[in-house]
Amino acid sequence: MAQSTPIFNTLQQLSPFLHRTDNDPRPIVLMTCGIAGSGKSSLSKWITTNHPSFKRLSIDSYVYAHHGLYSVDYPKEKYNDYLDEAELALRDELAQLIRSGDDVVLDFSFAFQTFRNEWKSLVEELGGRWVLVYLDVRADELRRRVRARNQLAVKDGDSAFLVTDEILDRYLAGFERPVGEGEVVLCLDGFAANV
């Protein structure tokens, strides 16, 4: 019998998925999944603040820490190369953290099922337990959040990439929503602006 997908509208409802149990003491790897503006980084930061056993790994933060701001400190043409570099480095860091017994938040978009499956398999091979959290946000709310983020005067790794309406449309059209993948769905309108 298929298990139903948990759908939550508060962060506190997610907390039971963030704890190890006597029956399953493996390190937890929470995988954020969502489109730009859905609140992945806000969720990741909330988790690391409220559940200090978790370490955050973010492709965007890695690129920012190692190369600076998109289109400011390096040319736009280097962006995809730096994303590839970040993914490889974070795979290694994930392996080290799991081997050390740490819990991890992977602050990635995980926009495609094949990519999600690849990382789930990696987590399992390393001895961890994955929790896939899909942040379900309406398209109009995503647009509002992305436009607000684009207007920030101070940029960091989480806000450096300019997401235009056209780019967001491509993201929306190409995103593969997880269905029946063992995901937890989080519906938190207004969350990203409040964390």
Identify the role of each PLM range.
Residues 1-21:
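N-terminal pre-Walker A segment at the start of P-loop NTPase domains
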Residues 35-36, 41:
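The conserved Walker
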Residues 81-130:
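Glycine-rich phosphate-binding loop used to anchor ATP phosphates in small-molecule kinases
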Residues 19-26, 97:
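Phosphate-binding P-loop
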Residues 41-102:
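Conserved substrate/cofactor phosphate-moiety recognition/catalytic segment
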Residues 38, 46, 54, 140-195:
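Conserved GTP-binding G-domain of TRAFAC-class P-loop NTPases and closely related GTPase folds
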Residues 32:
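Hydrophobic anchor at the beta1->P-loop junction of P-loop NTPases
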Residues 126-146:
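Conserved phosphate-donor/acceptor-positioning beta-strand/loop module used by diverse small-molecule
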